[in-house]
Amino acid sequence: MSSKGALIVISGPSGGGKGTVVKALMEMMPELGVSVSATTRAPREGEIDGREYYFISRDDFEEMIGDGEVLEYTTYCGNYYGTPKKEAERVTGEGRDLILEIEVDGAAQVKAKFPEAVKIMLIPPSLSELERRLRGRGTETEEVIQSRLARAVEEIALAPTYDYVVVNEAGDIEGCARKLIGIINAEHNRTCRMKEVIDNFTAN
């Protein structure tokens, strides 16, 4: 089997439970790698450079973009956020699968650069369930909730461009994480990833 790790891209609407499911996934499969993103925003209290993020200047980030050193990036509230290419190469080069929990725009960027990347969209069972989860946070205004719901519809419309779609059922975080594990394990048995093993039989 290929000694290089796979790029596993997980995205989905805000409030869909990505972060919670990915956390459960990492607890079940601690051998998975998670890349440290770079950002131009200032560190918050308690954040450490190289742990939560690599905190860099806007000029440095734009230079990385120009040099092709960013795997994917986006802007939010006037700041850049992105995955350094060398960070992804470091993790997969160690033979570990890399989990990228990113937005749909970033997922498309990764797939364009690495066609072998595995894209998984995590969605709620219904729009009404997503609305219930967003309201349950108790931290967002009505305007923000409606904006997130509209954005969710746009994002889920892109599901056909993904390799897999996984429904995050209410109250079944562990079950959802196990579905992701099944996908990851299946991906390791794809013919393209088993070329080394096959070649051992056909080399002579």
Model-derived segments and spans:
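Extreme N-terminal, non-catalytic leader segments
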Residues: 1-7, 30
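Conserved lysine of the Walker
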Residues: 18
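Post-Walker A helix-loop "phosphate-sensing" segment adjacent to the P-loop in P-loop NTPases
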Residues: 27-35
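Post-Walker A alpha-helix
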Residues: 21-22
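NTP-dependent small-molecule kinase module
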Residues: 139, 154-204
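Conserved phosphate-donor/acceptor-positioning beta-strand/loop module used by diverse small-molecule
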Residues: 98-103, 112-136
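P-loop (Walker A) phosphate-binding loop of NTP-binding proteins
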Residues: 11-13
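ATP-dependent small-molecule kinase phosphotransfer cores
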Residues: 39-98, 104-105
